[in-house]
């Protein structure tokens, strides 16, 4: 994957960069793995805004992704690499030996025509999914389970990965994308390799309209709002002296918002880097 740059024929094009989509197959999505996706506009079932700055955007269909990789010891051939509007990563269509089709996250280096497999006996190869106890130390992995059989939860965005650092008793020690060191059960599944589309974070949208296509609405700074709407609002002209806060009054810089006692604290060996 590479980034495509544009000639500055308009101000918005000057710094715009997009993916060249060269790694994608020229095929239509698999219909049996599509579902309707209703837009919420950031509202919950009461109609109240629970996620600000969401709304509009292009119509999408949801691609059903296999995060569990639970077809054990059945080889699958990569039929296509496809775009998914619902995530930053690309997805790969697998056709299993028994005829079933499934989408998975496409790791970097996976190509059409290759064969992948899940299970303890699978070889250490990009795209294969194995329990952590069968993966060598130092291997980069993604789509990692927190609980056996519940499906991958960690390292699923474009370009992300975790590194297997050690094995202690029933647990593996993983270095997370954030830098946190965390224990995960050795029986949890993980997929070999780094999630593809690693240049995604370097893309520049160039204009406000492109973010609107993605369903993002404008963010208004708290300082320019009224006192009734934001703790930092009001004042004559530009006023200072406020501690930076969220719209709900929580300090915005350096204030710890993680709950004091969480059940999962015992699995964290080293906290993430600030």
UniProtKB/Swiss-Prot annotation:
Xref: Pfam families: Ribosomal_L2 (PF00181), Ribosomal_L2_C (PF03947)
GO BP field: cytoplasmic translation
Region (Disordered): 223-274
Coiled-coil annotated spans: none
InterPro entries reported for this sequence: NA-bd_OB-fold, Rib_uL2_dom2, Ribosomal_uL2, Ribosomal_uL2_bac/org-type, Ribosomal_uL2_C, Ribosomal_uL2_dom3, Ribosomal_uL2_RNA-bd_dom, Translation_prot_SH3-like_sf
GO CC term (a single one): large ribosomal subunit
TM spans (from-to): none
The keyword Kinase is assigned to this record: no
GO MF terms, alphabetically ordered: rRNA binding; structural constituent of ribosome; transferase activity
Keywords in alphabetical order: Ribonucleoprotein, Ribosomal protein, RNA-binding, rRNA-binding
Keyword Ribosomal protein: yes
Record HAMAP family: Ribosomal_uL2_B
Matches recorded under PANTHER family: LARGE RIBOSOMAL SUBUNIT PROTEIN UL2M, RIBOSOMAL PROTEIN L2
Family in the record: Belongs to the universal ribosomal protein uL2 family.
Subunit structure: Part of the 50S ribosomal subunit. Forms a bridge to the 30S subunit in the 70S ribosome.
Entry function: One of the primary rRNA binding proteins. Required for association of the 30S and 50S subunits to form the 70S ribosome, for tRNA binding and peptide bond formation. It has been suggested to have peptidyltransferase activity; this is somewhat controversial. Makes several contacts with the 16S rRNA in the 70S ribosome.
Protein name (database record): Large ribosomal subunit protein uL2
């Amino acid at each position: 994957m590479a980034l495509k740059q544009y000639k500055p024929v308009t101000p918005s094009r000057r710094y715009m960069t997009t993916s060249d989509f060269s790694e994608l197959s020229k095929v239509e999505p698999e219909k049996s793995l599509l579902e309707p996706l209703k837009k919420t506009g950031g509202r919950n079932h009461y109609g109240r805004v629970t996620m600000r700055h969401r709304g509009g955007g292009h119509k999408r269909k949801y691609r059903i992704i296999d995060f569990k990789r639970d077809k054990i010891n059945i080889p699958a051939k990569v039929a296509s690499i496809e775009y998914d509007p619902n995530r930053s990563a690309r997805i790969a269509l697998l056709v299993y030996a028994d005829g079933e089709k499934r989408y998975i996250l496409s790791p970097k280096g996976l190509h059409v025509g290759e064969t992948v497999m899940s299970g303890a006996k699978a070889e250490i190869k990009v795209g294969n999914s194995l329990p952590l106890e069968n993966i060598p130390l130092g291997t980069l992995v993604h789509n990692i389970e927190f609980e056996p059989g519940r499906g991958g939860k960690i390292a699923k965005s474009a370009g992300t990965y975790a590194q297997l650092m050690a094995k202690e008793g029933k647990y593996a020690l993983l270095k997370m994308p954030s830098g946190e060191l965390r224990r995960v059960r050795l029986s949890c599944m993980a997929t070999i390799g780094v999630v593809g589309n690693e240049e995604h974070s370097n893309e520049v949208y160039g204009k406000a309209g492109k973010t609107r296509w993605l369903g993002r609405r404008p963010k208004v700074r708290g300082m320019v709002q009224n006192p009734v709407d934001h703790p930092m609002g009001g004042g004559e002209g530009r006023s200072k002296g406020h501690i930076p806060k969220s719209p709900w009054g929580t300090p915005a810089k350096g204030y710890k918002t993680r709950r004091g006692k969480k059940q999962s604290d015992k699995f964290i060996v080293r906290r993430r880097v600030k």
